[in-house]
Regions:
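C-terminal, active-site-flanking charged/polar segments
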Residues: 136-139, 148-150, 170-176
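C-terminal beta-strand-rich structural cap/linker in extracellular carbohydrate-active enzymes
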Residues: 158-181
Length: 181
């Protein structure tokens, strides 16, 4: 996904998930949404086809209510955030670093809205401390940060030319932080 985002820059990318949807439990679908969020890649579900007892079986995700109703809450939660990331535009230089270092950070927005997508790929929940080059992003007066998935205010501390934001992240979970100017 990192390679796709780099090569496509700010163009949309939506992989076509072509699989046995009945073998994908809700936890697999949620994981797919979280992994896609950090790269602003819209999750999609193609028409699946697989061989069973010598016959091709076709599965259409969006024609089968047992799939799309099960995952509807994820679409409602993630798609508006993905659209905001897309509208802001991916920036190849994040001007941010994370502690612990295994937390992935991507920046969206060069002008108006500045968003940071975070992903904790570890097996344990953690508090990610993100240090942002506030001066280079014109965020030196920022005193407020909000998480878009959880809808919570998070600690935001100015430190000279930088800004420190602490965000709780579940294991294998993503979050997007909006900074106000």
């Amino acid at each position: 996904m990192a390679r796709a985002r780099t090569l496509l820059r700010n163009k949309p990318y939506s992989p076509l998930m072509n699989t046995r949807f009945d073998s994908m439990g809700p936890e697999v679908v949620e994981d797919y949404f979280h992994k896609s969020l950090v790269w602003d890649i819209f999750p999609s579900f193609f028409n699946g086809a697989y061989m069973q007892d010598g016959e091709w079986v076709r599965v259409h995700y969006f024609q089968d209510p047992k799939f799309y109703n099960r995952d509807r809450h994820l679409f409602r939660q993630f798609i508006p955030v993905l659209r905001r990331l897309f509208d802001a535009g991916w920036q190849p230089v994040t001007r941010a670093r994370s502690q612990p270092r295994q937390v992935r950070v991507e920046r969206y927005g060069a002008g108006g809205e500045v968003l940071f997508a975070l992903y904790n790929g570890s097996a344990s929940p953690l508090d990610a401390r993100i240090t942002i080059e506030a001066e280079s992003l014109d965020l030196t007066h920022t005193r407020e940060a909000t998480t878009l998935l959880a809808g919570a205010k998070v600690a935001c501390r100015p430190d000279g030319k930088s800004l420190e934001v602490t965000v709780p992240l579940g294991a294998g979970k993503a979050e997007v932080v909006q900074l106000s100017r």
